[in-house]
Regions:
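Short aromatic-centered micro-motifs
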Residues: 60, 67, 136
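Short, flexible domain-boundary/linker segments around small modular repeats
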Residues: 58-62, 147
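Short, structured beta-strand/loop micro-motifs enriched in basic residues and often containing a Trp
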Residues: 63-73, 150-159
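Short, flexible, surface-exposed loop segments at domain boundaries
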Residues: 9-56, 71-145, 157-203
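Bacterial N-terminal signal peptides
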Residues: 1-9
């Protein structure tokens, strides 16, 4: 894998919050969108056709990346992804310095309806969990995401029960939000993270 994740040592809550405020956000997977042109059975060119905030074109190595339906979150068969189809792909953060750049996918989302608000993919770096919500810091951003207790949490490919307490550092999540930007559905991917920071309600 091109992504190297180091375990974070447990430190006091106040110190963790100060570090989050002062330190630049750790790089996370980068989002690209566009249409697909297959190069071989495991690699495609993803080209948005224009310069924008998500970049222009990137060569995506699929590897073991899940391919999911943008609306339902259900797994799709990668063999159904054809040239000309539009997808979002989260890659990296490591990029090969080539033209176009190359990277390995973490997640691919397809079957995107027109004008649909595509769910967003994050890696959690720290969490503050209460009975009412989970406030998350995520890689690649200094902003926080607040997941309310009312949000529907679902595990990826398992029948385990997941709760707000499972939104811990190291977890990767796919988040669908309502028109106000409040998360209403969260798909939680399996992880095996140790030495994480979790700030409890009582400190």
């Amino acid at each position: 894998s091109l992504i190297l994740c180091a375990a974070m040592p447990a430190i006091p809550a106040a110190a963790a919050e100060t570090a989050d405020e002062e330190a630049p956000a750790r790089l996370g997977p980068a989002a690209y969108w566009g249409t697909v042109t297959w190069m071989d059975e495991d690699t495609f060119l993803l080209d948005s056709g224009k310069e924008d905030g998500l970049g222009d074109a990137v060569v995506v190595h699929v590897g073991d990346a899940p391919y999911l339906d943008a609306v339902t979150g259900n797994t799709l068969n990668l063999e159904t992804l054809e040239d000309g189809d539009a997808v979002y792909a989260w890659v990296g953060p490591a990029m090969a310095l080539s033209l176009p750049p190359q990277s390995t996918a973490s997640l691919i989302v397809g079957n995107i309806p027109a004008d649909y608000a595509v769910p967003q993919y994050y890696e959690i770096t720290s969490s503050t969990v209460t009975e009412e919500s989970a406030v998350l810091h995520v890689a690649g951003s200094n902003d926080t995401i607040t997941v309310p207790a009312s949000a529907k949490l679902t595990p990826y490919l398992t029948k385990n029960i997941v709760t707000l307490a499972d939104l811990r550092p190291g977890a990767r999540i796919l988040v669908w939000s309502d028109s106000k930007g409040t998360p209403e559905k969260v798909l939680v991917f399996a992880y095996g993270y140790r030495g994480y920071i979790s700030v409890a309600e009582d400190g």
